[in-house]
Amino acid sequence: MKKIRSVTLFIATLLLTFNVLGQVSKSNDLYERQKAFVDLKFGMFIHFNIPTYYNQDWPDPEASPMQFNPTKMDCTQWAKAAKSANMTYGCLTTKHHSGFCVWDTKSTNYNVMQSPFKRDVVKEFVTAFRKEGLKVMLYYSILDTHHKLRPNQIQPKHIAMVKQQLKELLTKYGPIEALIIDGWDAPWSRISYDDVPFEQVYKLVKSLQPNCILMDLNGAKYPSDGLYYTDIKTYEMGAGQRLSKETNQMPALACLPLQSSWFWKTDFPTTPVKDPVKLVNETLVPLNKANCNFILNVAPNREGLFDDNALAALKVIGDTYKKDNQPANFKATGAPIISKNLAKNQPANSSWSDDMNIMDFANDDDFHSSWQSNPEVKQPWYEIAFKTPQTFNTVVIFESKPNIRKYKLEYEDNNQWKTFFEGENTKRVKLHRASKMHGSKIRVTIQEADSSPSIAEFQVYNEVR
């Protein structure tokens, strides 16, 4: 009997070891991919779609495919222009928020093959950029006003369409360095990662192209010092999102248009673009030093070509910018959060709260509101009481600023409290990964803090990889 127990214990230990080693290996693989992405330094965003034929970035969702007809489109011109600026890659908008697809897709008739142009723009883009020795990335919007993939309208058919479209993009056009996703769990799009399940999409992308970096432009919502639902932190500079060049410790991407907006407008040929020398010296170079890849948008006109003023600016950028060979310098971040937040909008309890800053502010999916402990409480506590018992392995405590220094985390299982962490952690984002736990409640007891504690978000996940 003892021999059987010993063998069983040995096998269980071995399986656990293999599982942990597998997770470490995947995390290390991602770390190498993140460094390789940051080391690309500088690339070209290309917003080219139905909005090009309107003077608005958000056109009529029912705009006819007949509008799209870039009779002189030359992706080789784009690629050579990118190369002249010392860029290393290009990224094309395959589908923007109005839902028009610029590739030969079987998922919808709202695509380029139904236009007078009848050419696969994605195919010509990847071919031209690779021929010039440049890597290729693709942009894809979850928000889709034409197909009614928008708040309070999402049905299973929409999720199936997203998966079909991503499968086409990741199987028909060779290796894709990175996929930039937009219009998803942002304050303005209001499509959550529950509405269109992020974990399913993430795993689909990685199953089709394991080396493809997946980024979501979710910087308007999620904090800068945690990887939430993205392999790379993203910053839309035109929307006021700013990376701290002094303190950033995350692999990052920042984007900005060369012209006044993302898609081409009729005044672009005669309107000055951003100062190319300033772009290099005040934006590109400082961002690169802060572990941030910079992607500059250049909008083709209605003929499918870059305007002369844009071409001239890119040449000046290339003459000014000399890509350094300094490798990315950030520590491994670990895998990003990709699963559903089990604590969101669940019943919450706490010790005495301060004024109106009560318990539900810490699990309302809003990083700008907080539960605040009353200053009279010496060791305040906060807990999530799940409506039904949950299995989980990851807990995140987010503070608006670092304050809590020492605390204990425990969960209730069969009316017994079990501690899984007790100690110090002074970071603003306190991330805890552990073996699987199962319980009806999870609680943090705060033992030391610099001032009266507050928690902006208390999050619980079951991360399966």
Segments predicted by a language model, with ranges:
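Serine/proline-rich low-complexity intrinsically disordered segments, especially terminal tails, linkers
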Residues: 8, 352-355, 375, 442
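Mature catalytic domains of secreted/periplasmic carbohydrate-active enzymes
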Residues: 23-357, 396-399, 405, 411, ...
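Aromatic, loop-rich ligand-recognition surfaces of beta-strand-rich domains
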Residues: 328-334, 363-465
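Bacterial N-terminal signal peptides that target proteins for export
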Residues: 1-8
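Cleavable N-terminal signal peptides
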Residues: 9-10, 20
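Short clusters of hydrophobic/aromatic residues that line enzyme substrate/ligand-binding pockets
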Residues: 103, 254, 362, 371-372
